[in-house]
């Protein structure tokens, strides 16, 4: 039971760290590539 709790806490920590990296991934509009645009720090696909 204790091992499962430690594993879940580590998984949550890794998910938060990955989320922070993705939010800070882009700062310029054209930084994400051809079919994506940077909106509020996140690469979003162009629709339309």
Curated annotation (Swiss-Prot):
Cleaved signal peptide residues: 1-21
Propeptide part(s) removed at maturation, as residue ranges: 22-27
Localization, UniProt: Secreted
Keyword Hydrolase carried by entry: no
GO cellular component: extracellular region
Function statement: Leech salivary gland peptide with unknown function.
Name under which the protein is recorded: Peptide HSTX-VII
